[in-house]
Structure formats: structure tokens, C-alpha cells
């Protein structure tokens, strides 16, 4: 009998990357392993994918440092850039790639570069011990997401200043789709046109705009780099599963029945007595709750899998446990496995039932959940 356990299939993760390469065969892959690799484990994901991709993308400097400290020597991109001077200095000393998305970041980089140049002009023995290296900068362009990025009309000003900066080794261009999972909305074509216009004066520089949905649906926008995220884990960026495209779910979330109880019609279950059975039945109590990251707001009827069949959650999810209706004829017993999502119960179905996105479910699992890698 096991408590809440997330089983991660390395084979499925590698399979999904190989499949992604068939969608973008000419492009380099920057695997997005931010947010603890979408909740699946930062370092295990990096180790599993290191020989299959050209680099990794992360959202926090700490993530980049952890990956590099394992001995990884490839490209690591900070997709939000550096947050302050200290982070910039570490980015320079560790030679991470960084996004530049605003005036403040550019000015800080120029300031540090000026100080660095002054140090270089000193005699060798008078220089400070810190050594910084020119790095690759990805200039973020706001093409319509309206979250991060310079306005298209600012691109040349930023480009010229970055080109003149001695701490910039190369400049790439990056943007992000806001509605790429809606192929018929027309907005993505608009973003592509803006990106093309903003970057066409710099034909020798690498470009990237396609993340998971862009990879699947917008081949014309694959450019030089694609940035797979959620699809690496066999999960759709929307509610329609992608297993029919050949993707394999990487995570199986499971636990065990810790009690099986007979329950009479008319009796309530759980906090607040929100569910009352209309018939005699058997209830299963499962070692899984919001303390493990399973949503407290999962409504009655949310599906789980017990011994190969779908059964509904009943009553409120509590911190450590939840209850399922096994049915009056149940032969289930204490210790039997309960699956919350995986290859036989797709996370997209669960997410849609709860009213959240799959991203939330996989990234909110807590440290109490046991992670096993196979």
C-alpha cells in the first residue's frame, strides 16, 4: 500500500521529445523545464533530455544553477531574464543565455558592461577576481501577448545598443503566442506578421516564437528554435488530448485505498455533509488530499480509476484524504491502487471536470508526494 505517488516515465519523456522532432525536424529544441519541469522533477528531466535537446529554458536563476551544477555544459536560457544586479553578475559568470525584455534590464547590462570594460583596462594584477563572459541575449518582442517584451518599434534601438555592448556575444529574437491553441481565431497570424516585420532587418540572427501549441499547429512559425513545454509530458496545451498524435503521458499520479466502508442511503459524507447517497453503497477512502496538491475544489463526480474502472469522488476533498463511491457490488479492498491521472485516465479529462488546466494539476503537487522515476 502506497500513499500519494507520482510515477514518472523517462521512456515516455524521451519518446515525446523524439516525436516533437518529427513536427519540427529542422529546428533546434530548447526544452522548457521551468517550474520544476512542470512539476515532474527538474534534475531528472534535465538528465533524461540532455542528449536529445540543444538547450534548456528556465524561469528562475536558481533552476539554471541547479542544472549547471550537475555538470551540464549546454545552453540554459533564463526566459524572464535577470531580476537584479546580483542575478546579472551570476548570469555573466556562469555564461547563461538571458532574455532582455525591458529598458531596465538593458540599462543594467550596459552599466555592468561599462564597469567591466574599466576593469579590463587595468593591469592584470589590479583586476578584481570576478570574471565575466560575453553572453547570448534573446531580445523579447511583444507581438501581441502584451505581457513581456519590447514594442516592435523599439526593436532596432534595443538591437543597436545590445550590438554595441561588449558583454553581448550574440543576439537572438524571441516572442510568445497568446492564442496558438486556437488555430482558427486569426490572432496568431497577426503575431507572426508582426514578428516577421520586426525581425526581417536582421536575417542572420536566430528566432523563436513557437512553444507547445506553435509546434503542433503553426509549422510556418517554427523558425530556428522551438520551445516544447507541456507536450513533452504527453499533455495537451488545451483540453483535447494529444495521445492520438502519438504522445505518451509521462506522469501517473496514484495512491491507495486505506479503507472500504459500507454506507447507507440517506447518510452524508465528509466535511459539510455535501454529498448524501441515494442508495446503499460502498465507499473507498483514499490517501490523497489537498495537502498533496489535489484540488480541494474537485467537484463530486470527478473521475478516478480503481481496478480498471472509473468511479466518482464524493464529498469534499480534505487535507489528507478523499472519498470515492465504489458501488454496492464493489470487490475492492484496502491497499488497492487508485489512479488520479495517467495513460488510462488522461489528465485533460480530469482537469476539464475540475475546471482548471492541466498545467495547474501537475505543477501544484506538494513535496509530500513520493516521486518515483522509471
Curated annotation (Swiss-Prot):
Query: Which residues hold substrate?
Result: 147, 319
Keywords, A to Z, come to:
Isomerase, Pyridoxal phosphate
E.C. number, please?
Answer: 5.1.1.1
Which reactions are catalysed by this chain?
A: L-alanine = D-alanine
Q: Name one GO cellular component term.
A: cytosol
Pathway given for this chain reads: Amino-acid biosynthesis; D-alanine biosynthesis; D-alanine from L-alanine: step 1/1
List every position bearing N6-(pyridoxal phosphate)lysine.
Answer: 34
Q: Which residues form the active site?
A: 34, 271
Q: Does the keyword Manganese apply?
A: no
Q: Which GO terms describe its molecular function?
A: alanine racemase activity; pyridoxal phosphate binding
Please give the superkingdom of this protein's source. Bacteria
Q: Which SMART domains match?
A: Ala_racemase_C
Q: Which cofactor does it need?
A: pyridoxal 5'-phosphate
Query: Which GO terms fall under biological process for this protein?
Result: D-alanine biosynthetic process
- InterPro entries listed in its UniProt record: Ala_racemase, Ala_racemase/Decarboxylase_C, Ala_racemase_C, Ala_racemase_N, PLP-binding_barrel
Q: What does this protein do?
A: Catalyzes the interconversion of L-alanine and D-alanine. May also act on other amino acids.
Q: Which family does it belong to?
A: Belongs to the alanine racemase family.
The record's HAMAP family line, in alphabetical order, gives: Ala_racemase
Q: What is this protein called?
A: Alanine racemase
**Species of provenance:** Actinobacillus pleuropneumoniae serotype 5b (strain L20)
Amino acid at each position: 500500500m502506497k500513499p500519494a505517488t507520482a510515477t514518472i516515465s523517462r521512456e515516455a519523456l524521451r519518446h515525446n521529445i523524439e516525436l516533437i522532432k518529427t513536427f519540427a525536424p529542422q529546428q533546434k529544441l530548447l526544452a522548457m523545464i521551468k517550474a520544476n519541469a512542470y512539476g515532474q522533477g527538474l534534475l531528472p528531466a534535465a538528465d533524461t533530455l540532455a542528449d536529445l535537446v540543444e538547450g534548456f529554458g528556465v524561469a528562475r536563476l536558481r533552476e539554471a544553477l541547479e542544472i549547471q551544477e550537475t555538470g551540464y555544459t549546454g545552453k540554459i536560457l533564463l526566459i524572464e531574464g535577470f531580476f537584479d544586479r546580483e542575478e546579472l553578475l551570476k548570469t555573466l559568470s556562469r555564461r547563461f543565455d538571458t532574455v532582455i525584455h525591458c529598458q531596465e534590464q538593458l540599462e543594467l547590462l550596459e552599466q555592468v558592461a561599462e564597469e567591466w570594460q574599466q576593469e579590463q583596462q587595468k593591469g592584470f594584477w589590479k583586476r578584481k577576481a570576478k570574471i565575466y563572459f560575453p553572453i547570448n541575449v534573446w531580445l523579447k518582442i511583444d507581438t501581441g501577448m502584451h505581457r513581456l517584451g519590447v514594442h516592435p518599434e523599439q526593436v532596432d534601438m534595443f538591437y543597436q545598443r545590445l550590438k554595441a555592448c561588449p558583454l553581448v556575444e550574440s543576439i537572438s529574437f524571441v516572442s510568445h503566442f497568446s492564442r496558438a491553441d486556437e488555430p482558427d481565431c486569426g490572432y496568431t497570424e497577426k503575431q507572426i506578421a508582426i514578428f516577421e516585420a520586426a525581425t526581417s532587418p536582421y536575417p542572420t540572427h536566430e528566432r523563436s516564437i513557437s512553444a507547445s501549441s506553435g509546434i503542433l499547429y503553426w509549422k510556418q512559425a517554427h523558425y530556428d528554435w522551438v520551445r516544447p513545454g507541456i507536450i513533452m509530458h504527453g499533455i495537451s496545451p488545451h483540453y483535447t488530448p494529444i495521445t492520438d498524435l502519438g504522445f505518451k503521458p509521462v506522469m501517473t499520479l496514484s495512491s491507495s485505498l486505506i479503507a472500504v466502508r459500507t454506507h447507507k442511503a440517506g447518510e452524508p459524507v465528509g466535511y459539510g455533509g455535501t454529498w448524501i447517497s441515494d442508495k446503499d453503497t460502498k465507499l473507498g477512502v483514499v490517501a490523497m488530499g489537498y495537502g498533496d496538491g489535489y484540488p480541494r475544489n474537485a467537484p463530486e463526480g470527478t473521475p478516478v480509476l480503481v481496478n480498471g474502472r472509473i468511479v466518482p469522488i464524493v464529498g469534499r476533498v480534505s487535507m489528507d484524504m478523499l472519498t470515492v463511491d465504489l458501488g454496492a457490488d464493489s470487490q475492492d479492498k484496502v491497499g488497492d491502487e487508485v489512479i488520479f491521472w495517467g495513460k488510462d485516465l488522461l489528465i485533460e479529462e480530469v482537469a476539464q471536470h475540475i475546471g482548471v488546466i492541466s498545467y495547474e494539476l501537475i505543477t501544484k503537487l506538494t513535496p509530500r508526494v513520493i516521486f518515483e522515476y522509471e
